[in-house]
Swiss-Prot record:
Primary role: Allows the formation of correctly charged Gln-tRNA(Gln) through the transamidation of misacylated Glu-tRNA(Gln) in organisms which lack glutaminyl-tRNA synthetase. The reaction takes place in the presence of glutamine and ATP through an activated gamma-phospho-Glu-tRNA(Gln).
Any Gene Ontology biological process: translation
Known EC number: 6.3.5.7
Organism: Streptococcus pyogenes serotype M28 (strain MGAS6180)
PROSITE patterns from the UniProt entry: AMIDASES
Protein name in the entry: Glutamyl-tRNA(Gln) amidotransferase subunit A
Length: 488
């Protein structure tokens, strides 16, 4: 018997009633992972021994009836540090790296007696939109194994969508939670910048990175955010604001809520059928009592260009620490210190990572800093101001998560610009530090379509309220791929 169709609350009730033990749930989860792994390739590392040991310890002390997450398995993206469990960032550079500390988000999960079941595949150092730049493997879409799962958190999304796990953690720098959530038909949230500590997250773009949850439903997503969100003295960018319960508005109606629909989000480059899906969702929100009106975010069209200058510049700085001296891969054909640096980085980094390091180094160079990095920062401010103007009059922004449904494996990985444009609709949210969620909203050609809801800073409760209201009157979240036991 598999438990992957049961919600976290249902699993908790079974654990409290002792109808199953944490060990049995962990064993069943490991079986679900193994039985589906060859088809989708969600995991880099499955921490079977450590997970079973932790489950046995939880059983020995007993399930805490007041702790919803006690004994619940959790998959963690492989750029989030886990003490004693390989954390590779899907790179040859860190193929053998075993951290000596836990990321704060993982420590928070352990504090609630969650069980880390394994580390999920991703684009190398979170740089990519298809999980094809991983050094280890290519993850496949849960709905169609000839399609990409999205990225960079493709493994975390596919693990949930395929029924390997119920909950997982990802990171989002320019859409890396929301895009794979959309491609796989699950719920993925990028919290407000600073809501979840970045301590222990292998840095890509420090002003953009944020850890967030994946789950099959809106409520379960909020329940996991309750666990991982916290202020943290170990992260200088950690926010002091802390909402007591992100599920508190779930179940409330949305009558009177004002929702903005940017015309730029339904313009050039957006698949016509995705546009139709979003407009149908807008009508659904109106039927629920909300007001949906067209607005403009005029500077959003510059988001991709701004993002790739800023993110690449920050990456070129952050990745200087990987030099073959302290930890990780070290080239064995070097004859002096200079060759250690050059050979290690040449052999240890993949093509996409090297491309972004070079772009970032160029943007930060003395002759081009003002023209590129400084100018990108100025346009970033204009993008933020656009959002501020909209949120002065509206509660949320509505739009598609992605311009298309999942594309084919090996179709865009040799066309960086086309790959970058896949994040056209998610990038502005990171540039502004806002919360954004992707929820299932329909299907095009048998593939899931994601609907994105964006809020002002610290408006996760309102986002969850609206997302749950939409979920309650639709059944897209209930439809599952064949690998999960569905009929699609």
């Amino acid at each position: 018997m598999s438990f992957n169709h049961k919600t976290i609350e249902e699993l908790h009730d079974l654990l409290v009633a002792k109808e199953i033990s944490a060990t049995e749930l962990t064993q069943k989860t490991l079986e679900d992972i193994k039985s589906r792994e060859e088809a989708v390739g969600s995991f880099i590392t499955v921490s079977e021994e450590a997970a079973l040991k932790q489950a046995a310890a939880i059983d020995a002390k007993g399930i805490d009836a007041d702790n919803l997450m006690s004994g619940i398995p959790l998959a963690v993206k492989d750029n989030i540090s886990t003490k004693g469990i390989l954390t590779t960032a899907a790179s040859k550079m860190l193929y053998n790296y075993e951290p000596i500390f836990d990321a704060t988000s993982v420590a928070n999960a352990y504090a609630k007696d969650m069980i880390v079941i394994g580390k999920t595949n991703m684009d190398e150092f979170a740089m990519g939109g298809s999980t094809e730049t991983s050094y280890f493997k290519k993850t496949k879409n849960a709905w169609d194994h000839t399609k990409v799962p999205g990225g960079s958190s493709g493994g975390s999304a596919t693990a949930v969508a395929s029924g390997q796990v119920r909950l997982s953690l990802g990171s989002d720098t320019g859409g890396s939670i929301r895009q794979p959530a959309a491609f796989n038909g699950v719920v993925g949230l990028k919290p407000t910048y600073g809501t979840v500590s970045r301590y222990g997250l292998i840095a890509f773009g420090s002003s953009l990175d944020q850890i967030g949850p994946f789950a099959p439903t809106v409520k379960e997503n909020a329940q996991l955010l309750n666990v991982i969100a916290s202020s943290d003295v170990k992260d200088a960018t950690s926010a002091p604001v802390r909402i007591a319960d992100y599920t508190s508005k779930i179940g409330r109606d949305i009558k009177g809520m004002k929702i903005a629909l940017p015309k730029e989000y339904l313009g050039e480059g957006i698949d016509p059928e995705i546009k139709e899906t979003v407009l149908a969702a807008a009508k659904q929100f109106e039927a629920l009592g909300a007001t949906v009106e067209e607005v403009s975010l005029p500077h959003s069209k510059y988001g991709v260009a701004v993002y790739y200058i800023i993110a690449s510049s920050e990456a070129s700085s952050n990745l200087q620490r990987f030099d073959g001296i302290r930890y990780g891969f070290r080239a064995d054909d070097a004859k002096n210190l200079d060759e250690i640096y050059v050979n290690t980085r040449s052999q240890g980094f993949g093509d996409e990572v090297k491309r972004r390091i070079m772009l970032g180094t160029f943007s930060l160079s003395s002759g081009y800093y003002d023209a590129y990095f400084k100018k990108a920062g100025q346009v970033r401010t204009l993008i933020i101001e656009d959002f501020d103007k909209v949120f002065a009059d509206y509660d949320l922004i509505l739009g598609p998560t992605t311009p298309t449904v999942a594309f084919g494996l090996d179709t865009l990985n040799h066309d960086p610009v086309a790959m970058y444009l896949a994040d056209l609709l998610t990038i502005p949210v990171n540039l502004a530090g806002l919360p954004g969620i992707s929820i299932p909203a329909g299907f095009v050609d048998g593939l899931p379509v994601g609907l994105q809801l964006i809020g002002p800073k610290y408006a996760e409760e309102t986002i969850y309220q609206a997302a749950a209201a939409f979920e309650a009157v639709t059944d897209y979240h209930k439809q599952q791929p064949i690998i999960f036991g569905g009929d699609k």
